[in-house]
Amino acid sequence: MKKILSFLFEHKTLGRETAKEVLVNIGKGIYNEHEITAFMTVFLMRSITLQELQGFQDALLELCLPMNFDGLETIDIVGTGGDGKNTFNISTLSCFIVAGAGHKVTKHGNYGASTVSGSSNVIESMGYQFKNNNDALRRELDEANICFMHAPLFHPALKNVGPIRRNLGMRTFFNMLGPLVNPAFPSYSIIGVYSLEMARLYNYLMQQQSERYSIIHALDGYDEISLTGDSKIITQEGEKIYSAIEM
């Protein structure tokens, strides 16, 4: 890690393979918490590159425990969080509305790190017991049209950095990764992001993947559709700005 940190402190960026290697090592517990904190802090001081984000995504997906729902078409509705607006868990609520409308939802979430409450906090407070058993989650999906996957049970790297993220209490690049590493590999994703820069980065990344997507950013700063201003929505077909009245 010392070589990687020295390289980054010279204002250089990581290639895709190097970024993947670092996050794989984090997932395997090779680095201590001080090294991981220093590494995460680098990306608080500058924007992440597309190559770095791709490498981090590659690492988490390589290490993850995948779920197989026999080709069932599902959707995930998720936000990066970190917009500083202190709203309630809108994407989590939206998942239940969509499931109630008859669509299959494979919701992937975590405890809040840069916010008061993440989707896992909400689901757990309702008495739900987290699990990573494929058959049990499939039964929930069949019976209720929704299942919930608590990220640390599927991603060792997220489990290892959880305490560090909570101690920092700030938005890190792991906020960006959560929506990109759903272990059920949903066929459609609706993703709210906290900045236009992040919306563009996500669009570049997801254009190279097979799943359908909508990326949402409210121009007044929310990582979801806003009731108080315009919202930009980006899909494979292009992008458009909608007013609150149009929505």
Which residues does each PLM region occupy?
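Conserved active-site and cofactor/substrate-binding residues in soluble primary-metabolism enzymes
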Residues: T13-E21, I30-A38, I48-G55, N89, ...
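Glycine-rich anion-binding loops and their surrounding alpha/beta cores
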Residues: F7, E62-L65, T87, G102, ...
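Core alpha/beta catalytic barrel or barrel-like domain that forms the active/cofactor pocket
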Residues: D70-V78, T106-G112, F174-L177
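A glycine-rich phosphate/pyrophosphate-binding beta-strand-loop-alpha-helix module
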Residues: M40, F88-A144
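Gly/Ser/Thr-rich helix-start
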Residues: I30, T80-D83, H103, A113, ...
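Acidic, glycine/proline-rich low-complexity segments that act as flexible tails and inter-domain linkers
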Residues: M1-T87, A101
